[in-house]
């Protein structure tokens, strides 16, 4: 009996050691989201990318995430917590996480960090972004074709270059169809606030807009469009199920392939901090199926999407600034540095840019 007990204890210990070794062999990849994964928008889409990592890399990885993390001291604590809990690669998915990631990356030099939509790097901190503005040009063209009032309502979060270039690209697309098209802007000073987003949509519709665009994360604005029997666009993910009659298309973010490649690089020992800006041609920016529009508008949108995928830049001159002063000459193309520092509107935007 004593020999049997010793044998059982030895077997249990062996299994425990094997399990510990297996856990140690796994790479822990972690994400920090500014909103809830149930926003069905920006944070949701990043989390879909995390799930794709799990599916693609299987038992090689363990993943974890923190959601609803505020930009500021809360973000400092979130990144430090994940680093202390054994995360080997951490993705911060909001612009406002930039300084917290820089700070925590210095404290944990052996942890790999990546930051979405920012511009600061370090020896163990890379940055990645998507050219959302490419898709917004197509949205602008569709809006100009579908709008009866010639006015779009645009709901936005914070006056950072990514948001400003999106507004401008949308306007350039719209004015390529209707030179007199206008956009009214409402700043809600939040990435995710369904109440504010809904109120903004109602106010814009009351002011004469008949189509709504957003650079915020909830489905609220599009649902208001559905209630008003008007139109709008999904943001970050396909929101058609929330507004089956209102959604014309959605600007969707496809993070999965990028996340898989970066986590695989971490596994292989080949990860290095990088500066990546992916677009339509890379499959990182996509447009959901074109719906609730005539065939000719759909064909136009498809043609423009292909044109951009083939290398055409929406910020190709001639383009004038909001006050009418020339910015880009005929055929001149804005470089990435200019876009990433964009702090002015193009002609046609009905708003004073907050400073």
List the model feature ranges, each with a label.
Residues 1-4:
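Positively charged n-region of N-terminal signal peptides that target proteins for export
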Residues 7-16:
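Bacterial N-terminal signal peptides
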Residues 17-23:
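Sec/Tat signal peptide C-region and signal peptidase I cleavage site
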Residues 24-355:
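A residue-level marker of the well-folded mature domains of exported/periplasmic proteins
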